[in-house]
């Protein structure tokens, strides 16, 4: 059998299997949306105004323990980054910055988990649907060649059924794109607040060093 004949026999399967594939992908898409929605909601919201003021006040007074308590009472990725930075107070700004950057990288991975699935479905589901439509049209003309008495009605019926695949592909893609953009916006805003907290801690802890017992104290004036 020639390669063309093999391909033709495959295309004559029609578009129904493509529809089932799109339905399966839509289930995956909805599952990702629900999982990401619950994850981002459960991560909590960091009260930047209130907790930020407490952090600045404690750190300017050299009270790192108080700053840690303020952060421990909060939720969200911002508090995780702040806690990582406060654990390194007294070891220099480089150690503080590296600890917060490492924590931010881990948080980014958690926030963006599975979002690539939504992006991929949003970009490719219409093409999968279009592929199903092409297969359906090929089958419609093949049916016409075997049933010439049916005329245009046979072709139109097959084409209309084939176009369903394109419609289903769009139905899968549009919600996926909307959800992807929504979650990406949430991630960007969260990471922006994380950066704001990190910069605040770096600036507030620049003059803090450790005493012999490991407690953090403000650096004395005059460099003594």
Question: What role is predicted for each listed range?
Answer:
Residues 1-51:
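Hydrophobic membrane-targeting segments
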Residues 3, 16, 50, 113-116, ...:
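Short, conserved clusters of charged catalytic residues that mark active-site
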Residues 8-13, 144-156:
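Membrane-interfacial hairpin junctions
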Residues 13, 23, 113-116, 120-123, ...:
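Internal alpha-helical transmembrane segments of multi-pass membrane proteins, especially GPCRs
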Residues 38, 43-151, 178-224:
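Predominantly long cytosolic amphipathic alpha-helical stalk/bundle segments
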Residues 161-178:
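Hydrophobic alpha-helical transmembrane segments of polytopic membrane proteins
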């Amino acid at each position: 059998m020639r390669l063309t004949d093999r391909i033709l026999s495959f295309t004559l399967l029609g578009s129904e299997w493509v529809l089932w594939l799109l339905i399966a992908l839509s289930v995956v898409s909805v599952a990702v949306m629900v999982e990401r929605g619950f994850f981002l909601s459960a991560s909590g919201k960091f009260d930047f105004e209130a907790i930020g003021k407490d952090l600045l006040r404690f750190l300017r007074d050299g009270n790192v323990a108080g700053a840690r308590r303020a952060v421990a009472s909060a939720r969200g990725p911002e508090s995780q980054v702040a806690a990582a930075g406060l654990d390194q107070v007294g070891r220099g700004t480089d150690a503080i910055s590296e600890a917060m950057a490492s924590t931010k990288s881990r948080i980014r991975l958690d926030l963006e988990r599975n979002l690539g699935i939504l992006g991929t479905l949003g970009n490719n589901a219409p093409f999968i649907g279009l592929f199903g439509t092409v297969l359906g049209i090929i089958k419609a003309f093949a049916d016409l060649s075997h049933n010439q008495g049916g005329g245009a009605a046979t072709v139109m019926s097959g084409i209309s059924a084939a176009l369903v695949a394109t419609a289903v592909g769009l139905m899968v893609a549009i919600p996926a794109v909307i959800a992807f953009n929504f979650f990406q916006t949430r991630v960007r805003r969260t990471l922006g607040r994380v950066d704001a907290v990190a910069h605040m801690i770096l600036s507030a802890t620049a003059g803090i060093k450790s005493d012999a017992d490991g407690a953090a104290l403000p650096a004395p004036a005059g460099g003594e």
